[in-house]
Amino acid sequence: DPLIRLKEAHLKGIIPDDTYDLILKRFPIVVGGVNRIEKASGIQYPVAYVEPSVVVSSPGLNSYEFGILFARTIPVMFEERFQVVIQISAPLVAYGLKGTIHAILAHEFLHYLELIRKISKMDLLSDEISGNLFENVYADETRLFESRAVFKDRTLLNHITKKFPSGFRDYKLEDKVIKYWIDKNLPKTNVSLDSNTVKLSMESLSKIRLDPQFQKRIDDLEHKSGKIRKKKLY
């Protein structure tokens, strides 16, 4: 159940009734987004759940430069099995516009594909950690699969290119989250940007078995993305 953590937080009285009801009411937008991405890509969306807090990252010393992370792609080893989980923050579900929610879900899906690509090539260990938000945005942009190679859905592609010209900023949404969530002292999780970088041991990497068909699909998408990038350059 993708809402299990939210339900637990509500039962404990951490999330108030009105906020909880709003998230439940708007959750079908997330379900619609996941279905849309699966249809547009022909690939199943990874496990996703709603995190009942706002996730805030600051790069450390310059603590004034903080960013709200509306969703994160998290690799986990669970009972010797590797799984990628998409964490969607509750404030995104509560206050995001439909197009924004779908764009962020699609963006995390591209992260997921990128992660699987790296695992298949075994090049996860040397991934650099970038300490400032701008660098992270830049690293993000240079590595992700081209959305046009992955999704056959023009509206979805428009959402992605509008929302992520060079990293995601949605000031209206951020203002809402600050006003209705952070200022009301609702749950907040602080993460350092370093913890957003994936670290898996060589041993756990060697245990991961990918479905050969899925791996071939990833290779095809990588090839297609490369072609689109070349076109952009010339």
Question: How would you describe each model-predicted region?
Answer:
Residues 103-116:
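Active-site recognition of the HExxH zinc-binding catalytic motif
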Residues 117, 123-165:
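Post-HExxH zinc-binding segment in Zn-dependent metallohydrolases
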Residues 1-75, 200, 208-209, 213-234:
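A metal-dependent hydrolase signature that marks the N-terminal structural subdomain at the beginning
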Residues 106-107, 132-136, 140, 176-179, ...:
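Short, hydrophobic/amphipathic alpha-helical patches that form generic packing surfaces
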Residues 51, 87-91, 201-203:
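Helix N-cap / beta->alpha transition motif
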Residues 154-234:
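Pan-zinc metallopeptidase signature
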Residues 1, 14, 18-32, 96, ...:
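Alpha-helix boundary/N-cap detector
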Residues 58-99:
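Active-site scaffold of zinc-dependent metalloenzymes
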